[in-house]
Amino acid sequence: MPKIKMIILALVFATILPVSAQEFSDVPALHTFAVGYAGAESKVYQSFRAVLDKGEAARPIFRRCLKTGSPAAKLYSAIGLYKLDPQEGTKALKSLASSQEQVPVMQGCIVSTYTVGEVATDLLSPNPQLLSFQAF
């Protein structure tokens, strides 16, 4: 039964997704750049890229979402800040390290659930096991 639940979650995340940067703060899951059997960019990931592509103008959006966004938006924001400025991103990830909020993570066609703290701590480690910055 848990496998069916994961498949259903993956399908939901692939169809009901934000399409604009304004909706970024409510993203339902953390997606890597390639998801699903086709390895395509999801709308969730595209909303992250839409913000990140703003360059320096993305910082205030990421900073706001780091505090008030969904669990996935908080992680995307820390990752985005890291891509813009590794020092600020590291500080953001450290601020999330103790979070017990649950976040679905989609890599390829696999959906797993972790705490925000687990993902943040893993990204900070020298040898990440769950995700790496290259996935974003």
PLM features per residue range, with description:
Residues 67-85:
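Short N-proximal segments of mature Sec-exported proteins
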Residues 41-44, 74:
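Residue-level detector of extended alpha-helical repeat arrays and alpha-solenoid scaffolds
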Residues 23-30, 54-65, 86-98, 133:
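Amphipathic alpha-helical scaffolding segments comprising HEAT/armadillo-like alpha-solenoid repeats
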Residues 17-21:
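Sec/Tat signal peptide C-region and signal peptidase I cleavage site
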Residues 1-7:
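Positively charged n-region of N-terminal signal peptides that target proteins for export
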Residues 47-50, 80-83, 112-126:
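Core register positions within helices of long alpha-helical scaffolds
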Residues 7-16:
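Bacterial N-terminal signal peptides
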Residues 30, 37-38, 66-72, 95-111:
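Short coil turns that connect the paired helices of HEAT/ARM alpha-solenoid repeats
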